[in-house]
Amino acid sequence: MAGARRGWRLAPVRRGVCGPRARPLMRPLWLLFAVSFFGWTGALDGSGGTTRAMDEEIVSEKQAEESHRQDSANLLIFILLLTLTILTIWLFKHRRARFLHETGLAMIYGLLVGLVLRYGIHVPSDVNNVTLSCEVQSSPTTLLVNVSGKFYEYTLKGEISSHELNNVQDNEMLRKVTFDPEVFFNILLPPIIFYAGYSLKRRHFFRNLGSILAYAFLGTAISCFVIGSIMYGCVTLMKVTGQLAGDFYFTDCLLFGAIVSATDPVTVLAIFHELQVDVELYALLFGESVLNDAVAIVLSSSIVAYQPAGDNSHTFDVTAMFKSIGIFLGIFSGSFAMGAATGVVTALVTKFTKLREFQLLETGLFFLMSWSTFLLAEAWGFTGVVAVLFCGITQAHYTYNNLSTESQHRTKQLFELLNFLAENFIFSYMGLTLFTFQNHVFNPTFVVGAFIAIFLGRAANIYPLSLLLNLGRRSKIGSNFQHMMMFAGLRGAMAFALAIRDTATYARQMMFSTTLLIVFFTVWVFGGGTTAMLSCLHIRVGVDSDQEHLGVPDNERRTTKAESAWLFRMWYNFDHNYLKPLLTHSGPPLTTTLPACCGPIARCLTSPQAYENQEQLKDDDSDLILNDGDISLTYGDSTVNTESATASAPRRFMGNSSEDALDRELTFGDHELVIRGTRLVLPMDDSEPALNSLDDTRHSPA
């Protein structure tokens, strides 16, 4: 009974699970079930969101991988273009095409590749590309878009025409092969400009410095205003005839004049070097092109900075004009000072350290200091082109002498190679851009007016200035030289880089497209016709620059030398006695040139090698007198002889020592016998970079 009773008592408990007395126990169970159900449903939703996130991540990875492959293909295209250009140059070394140069052929290669990319290869645009319209008063540089609670950042690419809204994303590869303009200014231009200064032929450059400065400064300004005025007339005509679809002001015309006033006769100079054209003509063209690029870029910056007072920012204002002139002078002088200062700092570092014992570090420091000049000037609001140009000249004059022999060869070859690759890359890219740039604006009236303007602007530059310069020059600039300089006004890398730097507006797009056509025409027609023009103008070729004065009477040679050197005689003495000993290991010790009160400073700043040089020159505390015998100095493959005082040549040499010393330094660097009074100064380890030209475009300093 007990067991039965025990079982009965348990029975109601089992029945009570579903009975009325146990209903309060069901509520927690229902709650538990509900929580489990909704939790399971939420888990399903969460897994769906995770799946979508994973799908988006996979899509992003695929897009990144596809973009990487496409970028690699684009770079491969340019590498193949450069390879083809190098092979073409090698072929032209053996068989020259009379009316075609390598640079023109590089542009043709770029045109063919651009044509294939434009019409032969179609990369479908992303289906997610959407065109959104919104009313804003200005174009923001950065745009944040909220997509389902996620914010995405978009950057401004530039203005496009309304009829191209549906074609912007038509070909992804065309957008990929169009580089950011800053790539040209920060990567490609610095080695080209630096090499121009580093390989400058100083003797011929300084002998014609007055004429070069006149052509570069006055001539570029004249050309800019002539072209700007003519183009303003064309723009006015276009407005009257309804051909102008956007704003185009007089300041835009002046900016276009500054852009196309930048000459780059790289093709002509290469042919001049191969044919050994008259050195005076070569010096005038090369010097003008070197400084002309610097003047053109500073002039364009000054025009952009032109801001008259009042609401209309495009009216003429005298105050704003003088302000722009002040900006021009300030930017140019500041850039010049910054470039020279960087060269001086590099010279001091290489002099007072023992980096020459570690050639790799020495070359690396030289390279980085030289390149940083461009970026430093741009960061401070100056012009990097001017800064890096004068940095190259300063480095060649001072720093080069402090480098070890191996580093001297390395720096010469490094910048020669970079210059060669950068120039050919730009010419190939020019041809490519004609088809890959998607915002071209071609107007026949503007194009024809531009061609007429550049010819008239070049003529207004060369002929009037040559007439004025001949009034004060002993060696006149002949009419055949003037015609050749007029013909050699090619446009190239600098004009292209200035034009492509800003293509955000309708006016800038038209200027860029027209500049591209001008570059093509001048390189192909004028560059290809250089040889024929030399023959037509009867300009002598096969001239050895080192033998140019053979056959000239001695009295005329001395007179010409004195006239060409008197402006620089004071600078030469200051440089030889103070700057060279301070910045290099050469020259007389500062202890002998500075006043006695500066003795401690002079001893601190004088290189020990300078004392060694002085000890080699001393002979029992007496100056070395060149009277009792002959002395010969062998340097490389040449020998310099000094005969007895009764010989006529040494008498001439002694009689005009200051002018001769200056001319010889500008000619041979400082590996020479420099006679100052009766002391024989023999600078040691002091040379200028005599470059072995690889690309026939920039050449060794004399």
From Swiss-Prot:
As for what it does, the entry says: Endosomal Na(+), K(+)/H(+) antiporter. Mediates the electroneutral exchange of endosomal luminal H(+) for a cytosolic Na(+) or K(+). By facilitating proton efflux, SLC9A6 counteracts the acidity generated by vacuolar (V)-ATPase, thereby limiting luminal acidification. Responsible for alkalizing and maintaining the endosomal pH, and consequently in, e.g., endosome maturation and trafficking of recycling endosomal cargo. Plays a critical role during neurodevelopment by regulating synaptic development and plasticity.
UniProt record similarity statement: Belongs to the monovalent cation:proton antiporter 1 (CPA1) transporter (TC 2.A.36) family.
Species this chain originates from:
Mus musculus
**Mind listing the GO biological process terms from this record?**
axon extension; brain-derived neurotrophic factor receptor signaling pathway; dendrite extension; dendritic spine development; establishment of cell polarity; neuron projection morphogenesis; proton transmembrane transport; regulation of intracellular pH
Membrane spanning stretches = 72-92, 104-124, 177-197, 212-232, 253-273, 279-299, 325-345, 373-393, 415-435, 437-457, 480-500, 516-536
Record's superkingdom? Eukaryota
Keyword rRNA processing in annotation = no
Question: Gene Ontology terms, cellular component aspect?
Answer: axon terminus; axonal spine; cytoplasmic vesicle; dendrite; early endosome; early endosome membrane; endosome; glutamatergic synapse
Q: What is this protein called?
A: Sodium/hydrogen exchanger 6
The record's statement on gene disruption is:
The SLC9A6 null mice show a 10-20% increased mortality after birth, yet the surviving mice do not display any obvious difference. Behavioral tests reveal a modest motor hyperactivity associated with coordination deficits and limited ataxia. Neurons from these deficient mice exhibit endosomal hyperacidification, as well as impoverished neuronal arborization and attendant circuit dysfunction.
Entry keywords, A to Z: Cell membrane, Endosome, Ion transport, Membrane, Sodium, Sodium transport, Transmembrane, Transmembrane helix, Transport, Ubl conjugation
- From the record, give the cysteines joined by S-S bonds: none
Query: What is its subcellular localisation?
Result: Endosome membrane; Recycling endosome membrane; Early endosome membrane; Late endosome membrane
Q: How is it modified after translation?
A: Ubiquitinated (in vitro).
Q: Which reaction does it catalyse?
A: Na(+)(in) + H(+)(out) = Na(+)(out) + H(+)(in); K(+)(in) + H(+)(out) = K(+)(out) + H(+)(in)
GO MF terms listed in the record are: potassium:proton antiporter activity; sodium:proton antiporter activity
Its quaternary organisation is: Homodimer. Interacts with RACK1; regulates the distribution of SLC9A6 between endosomes and the plasma membrane.
As for membrane topology, the entry says: Multi-pass membrane protein
InterPro entries from the UniProt entry: Cation/H_exchanger_CPA1 (IPR018422), Cation/H_exchanger_TM (IPR006153), NaH_exchanger (IPR004709), NHE-6/7/9 (IPR002090)
The beginning of the lineage is: Eukaryota, Metazoa, Chordata, Craniata, Vertebrata
